[in-house]
A protein has these predicted regions:
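C-terminal tail/sorting-segment detector
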Residues: 240-257
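Residue-level detector of functionally pivotal "anchor" positions at catalytic/ligand-binding pockets or at interdomain
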Residues: 206-234
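Short, aromatic/His-centered strand-loop micro-motif at the edge of beta-sheets
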Residues: 125-150
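Extracellular glycan-recognition surfaces and repeat-rich motifs
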Residues: 19, 27-57
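Flexible glycan-contacting loops in extracellular carbohydrate-active proteins
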Residues: 87, 172-201
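Carbohydrate-binding surfaces in secreted/extracellular proteins
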Residues: 23, 75-77, 141-174
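Secretory/extracellular carbohydrate-interaction modules
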Residues: 52-120
Length: 257
C-alpha cells in the first residue's frame, strides 16, 4: 500500500457576501460588529452613526465584508461643513487590511480637495499608492454634502459610481479595474480638524456581492491545504495515480512505482 502526499489547490467558487446596517438598534457593536476607533463614534438619537470626537484626528471603523464580485454598495453620508484637504471622508468598499496606510482596496472619497472642486470619486489603493479610477463632477460636494452613494462592480472588473442628491441616482462615471481580488473588510475613514470633529454622519449601509470568481482567481493561485491520499493495493505499476490540471491542460502527473 502506498501513501501519497499532494497539495490541493484552491478550487474557486462563489459565496454570497452581504450585510446591512441602519443602526435602528441603537448600537454599532453587534449585528454587524463594527470595530476600530469605537470611542470616537456613537449612534445618535436619530439612529445614525455619528463621529463624536473632540480633537483633531483621524478615525476609522470596520466590519467584516468579503463582497467583491457582482458587488453593490449603497450608503448615506452627511457632512455638516464644506469639505477640504483637512476635512473629508472615505468609505472603503473593499480592503484586505484595517491598516489604511498600507492596504489593498477600493474606496469612495467624499471631498478632500482644495478650493471649490470637492466631488465624489472612486480610488484604488495598492499599499501606499492611491489611484483615482473614477473622477466625479467637480463642485457637487462643495457645501454641506448630504448624499446617497451607490457603487457597482460586475464579475470582470467594471466599476460604476452613482450619486443621489435629490432622490435619483445618476452616474458619476465608469472604470475597469480587476487588480483588487480580495476583500476582508468594509470601512469608513474620517479626517478632521477640531471644529469638524463631530460633524460626520453615516447611515443605511447595504452591501451585496460574492466572494470570488474563476476569472479573478487566475491572478492569485494559492495552496489551501495538504491532504494525505492512501491508495489501494494494485498490481499495476507506473500508471498515473492522478493529474493536477491548470486551465484544462495537464500540469503534473503523479504515478506509483
Amino acid at each position: 500500500m502506498k501513501t501519497v502526499l499532494f497539495l490541493l489547490f484552491y478550487i474557486p467558487f462563489n459565496l454570497l457576501a452581504q450585510f446591512t446596517d441602519d443602526f435602528s438598534d441603537g448600537d454599532f457593536l453587534v449585528s454587524p460588529i463594527w470595530f476600530g476607533d469605537v470611542a470616537s463614534f456613537e449612534v445618535d438619537p436619530d439612529y445614525i452613526l455619528h463621529l463624536n470626537d473632540s480633537v483633531a484626528s483621524t478615525s476609522s471603523l470596520f466590519t467584516s465584508s468579503n463582497a467583491l464580485m457582482n458587488g453593490e454598495w449603497i450608503f448615506d453620508v452627511r457632512l455638516e461643513f464644506s469639505p477640504s484637504t483637512n476635512n473629508y471622508a472615505k468609505v472603503y468598499l473593499v480592503t484586505n487590511s484595517t491598516d489604511l496606510l498600507n492596504t489593498e482596496g477600493v474606496y469612495v472619497k467624499i471631498g478632500g480637495q482644495s478650493g471649490s472642486v470637492d466631488d465624489l470619486s472612486l480610488y484604488k489603493q495598492t499599499g501606499t499608492n492611491h489611484t483615482q479610477i473614477i473622477d466625479g463632477t467637480d463642485g457637487l460636494l462643495t457645501n454641506n454634502p448630504d448624499i446617497k452613494v451607490k457603487v457597482t462592480r460586475d464579475d470582470v472588473g467594471n466599476w460604476e459610481l452613482f450619486l443621489d442628491t435629490n432622490g435619483v441616482f445618476f452616474s458619476e462615471g465608469t472604470a475597469f479595474d480587476n487588480s483588487i481580488i480580495q476583500s476582508d473588510y468594509f470601512g469608513i475613514y474620517c479626517k478632521y480638524t477640531i471644529t469638524r470633529s463631530d460633524k460626520f454622519w453615516f447611515d443605511n449601509f447595504l452591501v451585496n456581492g460574492t466572494v470570488l470568481s474563476l476569472l479573478e482567481y487566475k491572478k492569485s493561485k494559492r495552496i489551501l491545504k495538504i491532504i494525505d491520499v492512501t491508495s489501494r493495493e494494485s498490481r499495476l505499476k507506473n500508471q498515473p495515480l492522478f493529474y493536477i490540471y491548470d486551465d484544462g491542460t495537464v500540469e503534473k502527473k503523479i504515478t506509483i512505482d
